[in-house]
Amino acid sequence: MPTPSMEDYIEQIYLLIDEKGYARVSDIAEALSVHPSSVTKMVQKLDKDEYLIYEKYRGLVLTTKGKKIGERLVYRHDLLEQFMRIIGVDESKIYNDVEGIEHHLSWEAIDRIGDLVQYFEQDAVRVETLRGVQRANEEKSN
């Protein structure tokens, strides 16, 4: 199982390849705001752990294992952003909140959050009911 740091790299590499068709060390460093030498070290570790294949000066490709986990990590991130929107978290806080919790939730918890997102999205009245509860709670606290 990858560490949280490894997950961040795999997720970013997956997104870059999906967007551009490739992921270079410099692109990964820029996206994660880290030094290229840090990326090289992590990419070598990910290669050793068979999440990707890295050839110096030639680039990298995700293995089947890397693609599978990358897809799941992107799904997790997107799902948590959806969940935050449903529960009414301010848009400007969503990204940082998701980054803060995504590595600490089990896949079972992610699946249950997925069920909850699906439940709310199946009927807009449910979201409105939640908003009503939130407004009532805000009025009580003021």
Swiss-Prot record:
PANTHER family: IRON (METAL) DEPENDENT REPRESSOR, DTXR FAMILY, TRANSCRIPTIONAL REGULATOR MNTR. The gene is mntR. It comes from the Bacteria. This is HTH-type transcriptional regulator MntR. Homodimer. Mn(2+) 2 binds at E11, H77, E99, E102. GO terms for molecular function: DNA binding; DNA-binding transcription factor activity; manganese ion binding; protein dimerization activity. DNA binding is strongly activated by Mn(2+). It comes from Bacillus cereus (strain B4264). Central regulator of manganese homeostasis. Its main location: cytoplasm. The keyword Manganese applies. GO terms for biological process: intracellular manganese ion homeostasis.
